[in-house]
Design a protein with these regions (language model features):
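Membrane-interfacial helical/loop segments at transmembrane boundaries in membrane proteins
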Residues: 1, 76-91
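Membrane-helix interface motif
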Residues: 32-36, 68-83, 114, 118
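Mid-bilayer segments of alpha-helical transmembrane spans in multi-pass integral membrane proteins
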Residues: 97, 101-114, 140, 147-148
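Transmembrane alpha-helical segments of integral membrane proteins
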Residues: 111-126
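A generic, lipid-embedded transmembrane alpha helix
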Residues: 51-75, 143-148
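Alpha-helical transmembrane segments
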Residues: 7-25, 92-107
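Membrane-interface segments at loop-to-transmembrane junctions
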Residues: 42-56, 125-141
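Membrane-interface helix-loop junction between the first two transmembrane segments
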Residues: 27-47
Length: 151
């Protein structure tokens, strides 16, 4: 029992790096989405209680989490050394996860624009979500984000 606990403690710092990176990447994704959307997301959520936008953003964050977990999930090799497991191979994996997730964030934002212009071209998704608070359109955007995150 104690041996298993000690083994967990040996790999704990390795996992902690991924947790911290995940939190920072979600904050980065929020900044990117604020930059690419023409409306103020926090204002829409706080003052207008926009459920449609809340659905869309939930799908956006879920899509990012799917990309991140997909990038992190790989065969785990426990090569613990004197540096608490922080080997050169480990840092290469961390950089790979970081780059993959940043590319995923960019692709998710481009996918929203493509769906707005090519798939849902008969109406403005921005107008439907921001002005009309159309929860159906918010759900469609959420589904697009999750689908792109899975791919």
């Amino acid at each position: 029992m104690i041996d298993a606990f000690i083994e967990v403690l040996k790999t704990f710092p390795i996992g902690l790096v991924y947790v911290g990176m995940g939190i920072l990447l979600l904050a980065f994704a929020r900044l990117v989405q604020d930059f690419v959307t023409p409306y103020k997301i926090q204002e829409q959520l706080r003052t207008h209680d926009n459920v449609a936008l809340a659905l869309s953003i939930a799908g956006y964050y879920l899509g990012i989490i799917i990309v991140f977990v997909g990038a992190v999930y790989q065969p785990f090799t426990s090569s613990v050394d004197s540096n608490l497991g922080f080997t050169t191979e480990y840092w290469g994996d961390v950089i790979e996860v970081l780059v993959t997730t940043v590319i995923g964030i960019i692709i998710l934002n481009v996918a929203r624009i493509i769906v707005d212009k090519l798939v849902l071209y008969k109406f403005s998704t921005e107008k439907e979500i921001v002005e009309d608070h159309n929860a159906g359109t918010g759900a469609v955007e959420a589904a697009v984000y999750v689908s792109v995150g899975i791919v």
